[in-house]
Amino acid sequence: MNLADFDYHLPPERIAAEPARPRHAARLLHVRGDGLDDRTILDLPALLAPGDLLVVNDTRVIPAQLTGRRGDARIGITLDRPLADGTWRVLLRNARRARPGETIAIDGAGGIAAEVIDRAPDGSATLRFDCDAETFRAMLDRAASLALPPYIPRPAGISEQDRQDYQTMFAAEEGAVAAPTAGLHFTETVLAALAARGVGLATVTLHVGAGTFLPVREDQLERHKLHAERGLIGPETAALVNATRARGGRIVAVGTTSLRVLETAAGDDGTLAPWHGETELFITPGYRFKLVDRLMTNFHLPKSTLLMLVAAFAGVERMRAAYAHAIARGYRFYSYGDASLLERA
């Protein structure tokens, strides 16, 4: 398939600039094999069965947006992920003024600077910050801000409300640049109803990287390569997933991040083992899902890798119909928008 197969027109007023309040007041489009149902997040427990298992991503978003100076040039820096040698993979804006071997002075960082180790044509680069890990983390709290997606305008800057809104209630393991947004809809009220229904809960970790903000530039999908993201599945989660499947329960991934880490670690027979490492799994129509039975996810950008993933999961034509329905019915899109619950095609 080509990139143009995943394009659609979204009226600008359908892009959510703020989350629903309370979080569980968001709408939920149930995409079934034989139709579409308009629901809310509070209906989620009734749409699942006793013995099903929800798998959520417990990554925590870090302040990852820095600015720096090279001479009179202002350079934007979005952290992506740390590398084993202590350097950081980043995305740069105005990167032409930052060549390998040169140094960027970080704004508001008390004298901390970063050496450019290498730079790629897509704006990604490797930086070495001249401080230890503890000092670096403290510097982020002083000098960095949340890297909100560009479609969430904040002309006055990031607020304390944003810092609260852009974390899920499951956030525990620091490392994400962007939030796993399907998890933003959960509250204690929803969790209590799920527990009363007999639905289990398990956690995985996938640290969403800065590559999530990059567009797909290849018209032929097979030529596109995802940026690597770090993840972990512990032994307790692996055991819960395997036990759920053995007794006939369904695995419900909360978010594309949870789905990608589960599918990365699953064996060909769907058995899950503890895992940690990096994944570059790029799911497009034709992919054979090994483990996940249902997917809860927000509504994604045109021509995005996440839209390709949901089309692979629920079917291309079914998702076209679902998105047309959601636009016509006034659903709110993207990170702070409404959600969908997809049954696997």
From Swiss-Prot:
GO biological process: queuosine biosynthetic process; tRNA wobble guanine modification
InterPro entries reported in the protein's UniProt record: QueA (IPR003699), QueA_dom1 (IPR042118), QueA_dom2 (IPR042119), QueA_sf (IPR036100)
Keywords for the protein's UniProt record, in alphabetical order: Cytoplasm, Queuosine biosynthesis, S-adenosyl-L-methionine, Transferase
Signal peptide: none
Record-listed E.C. numbers: 2.4.99.17
Subunit note: Monomer.
Protein name according to UniProt: S-adenosylmethionine:tRNA ribosyltransferase-isomerase
Source organism: Acidiphilium cryptum (strain JF-5)
Gene for this chain: queA
